[in-house]
Amino acid sequence: MVAISEVKENPGVNSSNSGAVTRTAAHTHIKGLGLDESGVAKRVEGGFVGQIEAREACGVIVDLIKAKKMSGRAILLAGGPSTGKTALALAISQELGPKVPFCPLVGSELYSVEVKKTETLMENFRRAIGLRIKETKEVYEGEVTELTPEDAENPLGGYGKTISHVIVGLKSAKGTKTLRLDPTIYESIQREKVSIGDVIYIEANTGAVKRVGRSDAYATEFDLETEEYVPLPKGEVHKKKEIVQDVTLHDLDVANARPQGGQDVISMMGQLLKPKKTEITEKLRQEVNKVVAKYIDQGVAELIPGVLFIDEVNMLDIEIFTYLNKALESNIAPVVVLASNRGMTTVRGTEDVISPHGVPPDLIDRLLIVRTLPYDKDEIRTIIERRATVERLQVESSALDLLATMGTETSLRYALQLLAPCGILAQTSNRKEIVVNDVNEAKLLFLDAKRSTKILETSANYL
């Protein structure tokens, strides 16, 4: 499986530093769907070549997701191998941006010994649903100018002293303020290792202390220092601050499913043991949903339906498909994008149910199907040329034509995978450009699937 979120950009393509080493993944060249303002796909744009209808259909889906009119629906990307199904799913995630949850997985990931497959599916469903919580907090923010703990006699007697309160002076761009804080807040200040000259903020309601960094007025104090310097906070010391936090429903489920234990010895020993992966009950999820609904009604939170991408959907069995039907009808559901490279095939878990793409007929009826078409020779040549640019390889025109022909006769993946070996062979011959001889030599060294099959057929008695 290609990790969809692994490489978002390749700064080495246009970088002047030729010595920089950048990792190139299978879909590094994909930057988006490549649509104009009216939603029409350009032939070569955003890392895509061709697939005009499929890209325009995905563009409509992206608009529906942004308008929040697509939740609880499902799309099927259907097409042969090497036709860009995973690339389309990656492009959808990039068009939606980082704030919209995107959860990719392969059909075989749902099978586990410890947890039911339907439970794993529901976990990924909840991972693909985001919750944006907006909270207005009263905070005191500024540079620490005074930090004085006040001692008092120990009420229990003896010679020891206790902290009765703490005097903290804070300075901002518009004034200063002196605060008298509780001793428990002083413990938080000590944990954050706050000293005079640090910029901190203190939440008025909870008393939580956060050290932001060192004031930039002290930047010239040392020649070398590991501190992060921040400017003096603007405005008054006492202010109202809006804090936005993005979480998923699965995060809330896990937080409530694993409460902290008590202080007794048995509870502490239990926390030391490695927790086994367990199922989250439906009752707990319903309670979380009630709290989420309450926050939404109060205007504190906003629900963000994301995208759940399931590749190789033909690997799912009839039980998961039945559960998927039910999950799609839920009032809290993400957009589900499925991908399959199979035609008419038997549904897994059945003996005689043959259905398109390995998906049962009742689920097929719910899907919007987007078809991806095989690439022609010119499109394969353009893809190989762009891929060579991403991998910083120079290929002469005749070698590109030969690779395009091989991609047409065998597969696009085989032609793309030959690029790196061809580059090594060209370097071995002290050439900066890949030529036809390099391609032919790499072809002899590495077999494609068709030639490998022929060899096995002729040597069946030997192997």
From Swiss-Prot:
Coarse class of the protein's main subcellular location: nucleus
Record-listed ATP binding positions: 79-86
UniProt EC number: 3.6.4.12
Reaction equation(s) it catalyzes: ATP + H2O = ADP + phosphate + H(+)
InterPro entries on file: AAA+_ATPase (IPR003593), P-loop_NTPase (IPR027417), RuvB-like (IPR027238), RuvB-like_C (IPR041048), RuvBL1/2_DNA/RNA_bd_dom (IPR042487), TIP49_P-loop (IPR010339)
Cellular component aspect of the GO annotation: chromatin; Ino80 complex; NuA4 histone acetyltransferase complex; nucleus; R2TP complex; Swr1 complex; TTT Hsp90 cochaperone complex
UniProt-recorded Gene Ontology molecular function terms: 5'-3' DNA helicase activity; ATP binding; ATP hydrolysis activity; DNA helicase activity
UniProt entry keywords in alphabetical sequence: Acetylation, Activator, ATP-binding, Chromatin regulator, DNA damage, DNA repair, Helicase, Hydrolase, Nucleotide-binding, Nucleus, Transcription, Transcription regulation
GO biological process, any: chromatin remodeling
Family to which the UniProt record says this protein belongs: Belongs to the RuvB family.
Family annotation (PANTHER family): RUVB-RELATED REPTIN AND PONTIN
Protein name: RuvB-like protein 1
